[in-house]
Amino acid sequence: MKALRTLTILFALALMCLPAPSAAAAEKPFKLDICAMPEHESFIFWYAKEQGWDKDEGLDFQIHFFQTGMDQLEALPAKQWVVGGTGTVPILVGALRYNTYLIGIANDESWVNAVTVRPDNPALKVKGWNPEYPNLLGSPETVKGKTFLYTQSSSQHFGMSEYLKALGLTEKDVVMQNMDPAQVLAAFDAGIGDFAGIWPMWLYIGMERGNKLIYQPGDVNAVLTLTLVGDKAFCDAHPDIVVKFLRVWLRGVNMIKKEIKNPKLAEQYHRFWTEWAGQDIEPQMAKMDLEYHPVFDIDQQLAIFDDSKGPSQVEQWQDKVLDFFASQGRFSPEEVKKIRGSGYINGT
């Protein structure tokens, strides 16, 4: 995978400098099956298809809707897709059981796997208890013994554990109540719990109802990402197609970075959620979700995948998440070893 990944990124970088091939000059477009979830990263696939960017590269995006990352993986043996976007845990399970590669970072989810509180929570008034994170709110005194609503073994659970760690606490120092995110919001609205671990779109609904952000994993450099995933056999056989796929992806990234404050982009993002994802969300929530998901351009991708001086940032991020889920019993020690030795990131 190291050769593939280097080839892919460098070709994408080189091709960025060349004019895109016209659809008229291309032969019959290559039908590319893409897995997508109702998540931010799928917007680029959808928007690229809407704009005809796939045709510019001689591709024909066939975007397949999956509700979860695990649903995606279960469809892979039948080759229902060969590239796409997936989540934190599925990329690890894919490396373990489905022969997948991590071929890029789709976005940074560190700002949306958040913890919210009610406006009168005393922890909001304490800032900088940990000098390593001067903007972090809360302290051991204002958090210890309190009730946290959360979804066990989720990416948000990982983020919440990092919050407690930054305050010198563990889950044993608080009361943890496990429920799904919709139940978290309903329970918190009913006055249950002191801290609510939650993610979009329930996060934004709660904020509109007056809940306050007290913590986002990015506050303590706990990075959570969504990833671009590829079927190993396909990627090894068709690196040129992977390059073209990434070129379309990077075109979308550049567009988002340039137009992030443009109301018309927010309108398109809202249309994506209502028409493709099938979720009737408020326009303001769509705008927030778009702005809360930083994306990585080619220079940033090269930087975070650079392993010339040791493990890359991507490897470090993935290892930290893997360690957490292993501690939760999601992966056995043998499975952790297999994932790390699979070469799913850089072929080592």
Range-by-range predicted roles:
Residues V321-T348:
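Long, low-complexity C-terminal extensions of enzymes
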Residues A20-A25:
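Sec/Tat signal peptide C-region and signal peptidase I cleavage site
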Residues Q183-G278:
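Pocket-lining segment of extracytoplasmic ligand-binding domains
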Residues A26-T170, V175-N178, D194-P200, Q216-P217, ...:
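Short, glycine-/small- and polar/acidic-enriched structural segments
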Residues A237-R330:
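Secondary-structure end/capping motifs
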Residues M1-I9:
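Bacterial N-terminal signal peptides that target proteins for export
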